Every structure is written in structure tokens, then in C-alpha cells.
């Protein structure tokens, strides 16, 4: 395992997350969707549900819960980002949505990921 810059590490982690999501039946709609509120890592369709997915990457074993990785402030930010995306993409406005997390780790044996469906809910 060679040295990766933080940017390169994050990009590789997101690539691996997308690969794992596709294996689990997700259809990737968009990556790195930016707005004035920040950036959504991955937007996907899982069945009829629009999924806003946050990728959390670490060197070493995946440990802890998605709730620990995505605090309340980050959850609110992701909610604002999701709402902005839905407003900009009205075809998806009526579709149900949820927030998933992909916890990605790079270990000596390679990449590992855990997909956490409904990692948090905002109540809207």
C-alpha cells in the first residue's frame, strides 16, 4: 500500500463505495454534487428510493457507527444539500428518499466497506 494524498485517498474510497453500492443494486445518479451548502458524495437510486450517501473513509479497520461518523451538524448539512438537489432536479421531488452511509477502510489486505442504510433520518 503506497502513500496517498488525502484527496486521492478520498477519491479512491468513493470509487470503492460506488463499486460496492452497484453490487448491492444501487444505480449511481451523480457523484460529488455541489451546491452553496457543500457537497453530496453520492446520489443513487435504490429501487424507487433516491439515496443521498455520505462516504466516510479511514485508514485501518472500519469501527464505530455511522451515527458516530456523521454528527448532528453534518446530518443537517446533508439535509440542506439533499433539499437543494431535489429542488434542482424536480423529476425526483416526489420520490421517497433516505440517507445512507458507506464506511470505507483501507487495510493491508485491501479496501473494505460497510453500507449503512437509513444511517439517519431528518423527519421531513
Curated annotation (Swiss-Prot):
From the Swiss-Prot or TrEMBL record, give the protein name: UPF0102 protein Mmc1_3298
* Xref: HAMAP family: UPF0102
User: Which InterPro entries does the annotation name?
Assistant: Restrct_endonuc-II-like, tRNA_endonuc-like_dom_sf, UPF0102_YraN-like
Query: Could you state a single Gene Ontology molecular function term?
Result: nucleic acid binding
Q: Which family does it belong to?
A: Belongs to the UPF0102 family.
UniProt feature coiled coil, ranges = none
